[in-house]
Structure formats: structure tokens, C-alpha cells
Amino acid sequence: MPAPQPPIESRDRILAAATALFAEHGYDGTTTRQIAAASGLNMATVNYHVGGKADLYREVMRLAHEAERAVVEGALAAFLRDAGADPAGAVAAFTDRYLDFCLEQPHVPALWMRRWLADAAEFADLEDRYARPLIESVRDTIVEILPGNSADEAELAVYTVLWTTHGFCRSAIRDQVPRFRAHLRRLVLKQLGLPEPSGQPGQTEPSEQRAQPQQPDVPAGIA
């Protein structure tokens, strides 16, 4: 008889399964029974470790937000450090880092894009709790460092990165990462009134070989 699964391992398996299913099918299109089957556990075990589907969804979104926040805060710190000497290069580096994150963790843009389609409408607080503070922190930093841009202009630039990157990462053209990266840089720099940086070093393309969209990856540490 197989030994019982340790509580942490079981919880991580449930979260990994739920993350993939919510990202691919949305909250409304996923059942607790599907999550239990995907995690290889029974429904009683799922309920014991994470509660109901609503509790599980909130935890999945919290983990996605924490991963995204860590990357955005790190990229903002680098932007603040470098923008004085090379504002265009700092902006390009920020967009590169966010694109890399979305390619490495495709479940994050997938989860948010599901919400854009009115999925999980009963969780209306998640945008204000998670997305809005990050958007405002990037917007306010742009206005502070690049004073030629109004708050409205800076916010639209942030949304440009968000919408285009999320859409690209869910598309069938993920073999075009270098082409899209260059396009995104040009687009955002033009929005912010900055020239393209000269001699921009080549970027490592962590996902260039992913020619077709894949099932969303699960958060690091819970697979």
C-alpha cells in the first residue's frame, strides 16, 4: 500500500494542477473534480488541504501576483539605477525583463487574460488588490524619471507592455521572440518620446525554441 502523501507535497500538487487548469480553461470552466483528477488526489483531500474552489483560485492568483511583483520590483530597481545615464536603454531593459518573465511563466499572463474575458467575475477585488498597485508603481516611476510624460501617457505605456506582451505569450507565434522584442521596445520608446538605444546588447532568448504555445507552466516551487 503506498504511503500517504505528505501535506505540503499534496498541497503543492493541487496548486500546480489548479494553476494549469485555471490558466487554460478559466475559473468558470474548471471544476474541483477536474483539479482533483489532475493532481491525482480525491476531492476530500483537495478540500482538506486548500478548501473550496474559490479558496484555491484566490491562492493561485496570489502566487501569480507574488511572482510578478518580485520581477516588476526588481526591474524597477534596475530602471531607477540606470535611467539617469541611459533612459532609453533602461526602458528597453525593463520591457525585456517583463517579456522574459511572461515567457518563462506563461500561466501568469494566461490567468489575467482569462479575467479580461469576464472569467471569475465574482472576484472583482483582485485587480485592485494585485494588478492596480503594480501598474501605478511603474507609472509613477516613469513620471518621476521621465518628466516629459504625463501620468496618463505613462499609464498607457504600461498598458501597452501589458496587453501586447500577454497577447503575444498566448499566441501561436512564439518562435518570433526576437522580432516581437524589438517591436515592443520600439513601440514603448516611441510612446515615451525616447530614441532607440544605440548598441543595445543582444538578449538571451529563454523561450526562442518554443515555436508553439504550450500548456501553461506551473509556478516554480510547486510542481
Task: Annotate each language-model stretch with its function.
Residues 10-19, 35, 60-72, 138:
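Generic hydrophobic, amphipathic alpha-helix propensity
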Residues 13, 21-55, 59:
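Helix-turn-helix
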Residues 17, 21, 38, 164-171:
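Amphipathic alpha-helical interface segments
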Residues 59, 74-104, 148-161:
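Hydrophobic alpha-helical connector segments
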Residues 63, 111-115, 129, 160, ...:
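Short acidic/histidine-centered micro-motifs embedded in hydrophobic/aromatic stretches
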Residues 66-73, 89, 110, 120-146, ...:
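Amphipathic alpha-helical packing segments from all-alpha helical-bundle domains
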Residues 100, 104, 132-144, 148, ...:
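C-terminal peripheral helix-coil segments that are non-catalytic and often amphipathic
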Residues 102-125, 171-175:
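Amphipathic alpha-helical segments used for helix-helix packing
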